[in-house]
Amino acid sequence: MKKLFIETLGCAMNVRDSEHMIAELNQKEPYELTQNVEEADLIIINTCSVREKPVAKLFSEIGVFNKYKKPGAKIGVAGCTASHLGKDIIKRAPSVDFVIGARNVSKITEVVDKKHAVEIDTDYDESTYAFGEYRTNPFKAMVNISIGCDKSCTFCIVPATRGDEISIPSDLLVQEITKAVATGAKEVMLLGQNVNNYGRRFGATEEKIDFTGLLQKISKIEGLERIRFTSPHPLHMDDAFIQEFASNPKICKQIHVPLQSGSTSLLKVMKRGYTKENFLGRCEKIRMLCPEATISTDIIVGFPGETEADFEDTMDVLEKVRFEQLFSFKYSPRPHTEAAEFEEQIDNKIAGERLTRLQTRHTEILDEIMDAQLGKVHEVYFDELKSNGRVSGRSDDGKLVFVEGSEELLGKIVDVRIIKTSRGALDGVLV
């Protein structure tokens, strides 16, 4: 049996794309997954291009893999960097055998045997394609509810790499989730660039349904106990959506609300479509209707033209919302984006200092949040067995929890009392 090594860089959608490629390849011929690149017959790097760092890592990895691969092994590059660099990847790294874009993963079996094949059509519609079945974790499933993005944020390369947004028909989603539940999954993660923009456009159907309606429809699936989703867009967080999030017992009380900046003037330049006040209002509504919810966010510092006053607006939102989780980065100019051409680029040292201030303050907030968990009881869904005699899972609000236990806990939702806290996880005992 041939062996497959696949390295996934970037977001949850890339993880799901990797699962899709594994499933498609195995429908053509059996592959055994390996963590050892030296024994692999096929090596795939599934790439991210949101920032420059993972792009640079790609070419470093290609060099390493080419050095250690066995004779005859193939190297393929997939994902967002594949979409935006295309054949230039092969020009820069001739050892690469094929390139397949983020919108074309269903074609993996077509390109794998074609020397220097390049498939990067960002208009290709995979919304009704019946992918094979494969899950990295048997106890939970990730499901794409849409592909692409219809926004034009001036800092973001994703629309150029994943194409315009198309929603996947709800009946197909119900079928996919029902199959996952039948094979052991009690939790589903719904994926999309802007999940709550679901239903704006379908490729092959005239269906009329929005994200709130989709959540209600999926909630009726028997045996499905938990629903998560990422990422919603603040612009589409209407009252009906927030009410559904707060009141539906199957929806986990964890929500990602990408801020990017707390400055209304910068948000306008970013083309985000909301103001600081709009954002705070939506978070306040979530906290009011669902006090137990955890809110996470994305923040970019050093965006072109960012003043100290702009940055202080971001810090003010951090203080007011007290995000439980923060994904924060220095602005990274990306090709095919408006912001890369802006004149007022911020000095890297200033951006770095602001990032440190932001992360330091968030760390203080996070310590307070996690310390307050001591003695509390959480419902934890256990899905991973560790090598040290411990089992890990997630609470309803998304916190990572460890307990002493065995594989008998896997796939079960159990009450756990927290006995130890740390910044990244909680330790508990079964109640």
Swiss-Prot record:
The gene is miaB. PROSITE patterns: MTTASE_N, MTTASE_RADICAL, RADICAL_SAM, TRAM. This is tRNA-2-methylthio-N(6)-dimethylallyladenosine synthase. InterPro entries: Elp3/MiaA/NifB-like_rSAM (IPR006638), Methylthiotransferase (IPR005839), Methylthiotransferase_CS (IPR020612), Methylthiotransferase_N (IPR013848), Methylthiotransferase_N_sf (IPR038135), MiaB_methiolase (IPR006463), rSAM (IPR007197), rSAM_horseshoe (IPR023404). HAMAP family: tRNA_metthiotr_MiaB (MF_01864). It is found in: Cytoplasm. Residues 135-368 form the Radical SAM core domain. It holds the Pfam family UPF0004. Monomer. It comes from Sulfurovum sp. (strain NBC37-1). The keyword S-adenosyl-L-methionine applies. Its cofactor is [4Fe-4S] cluster. One of its GO terms (cellular component) is cytosol. Catalyzes the methylthiolation of N6-(dimethylallyl)adenosine (i(6)A), leading to the formation of 2-methylthio-N6-(dimethylallyl)adenosine (ms(2)i(6)A) at position 37 in tRNAs that read codons beginning with uridine. [4Fe-4S] cluster 2 binds at residues 149, 153, 156. Binds 2 [4Fe-4S] clusters. One cluster is coordinated with 3 cysteines and an exchangeable S-adenosyl-L-methionine.
